[in-house]
Amino acid sequence: MAQGSGSASQAKFWVALLFCFLFFWENVDAATYTVGGSNGWTFNMATWPRGKRFRAGDTLLFEYDATIHNVVAVNRGGYRSCITPAGAKVYKSGKDEVKLGKGMNYFICNIAGHCESGMKIAINAV
């Protein structure tokens, strides 16, 4: 009986280890992108995502002057209209890290006139 009990304990250990591996695997492959590159989060951002392959779990790093800009995670309507929906998450540290969810992710600066001047991005994470 002792041998059977040991085998069950070993099996539980390996199953737990497998779950840990699978849980952390997604983050191992995650990338971090500095939005806007060396220019940071600024105006005329529409072309910045082109040519990049974003995945769910990747991180966007928004670097900007927090005294004049912010970052707001919005829905498609907020992105198109440059209007912040109720309950939208507003980031304002000047160095914000945002993890991408699967599908479309939309971000704007909601300081008056900034979104309308191209301070917005739409990212599709696969």
Predicted region positions:
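Extracellular/periplasmic metallocenter environments
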Residues: 2-16, 21-41, 67-69, 80-126
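Short alpha-helix capping/helix-loop boundary micro-motifs
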Residues: 41-50
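Short secondary-structure boundary/capping segments within folded domains
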Residues: 51-52, 62
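N-terminal V-set
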Residues: 60-80
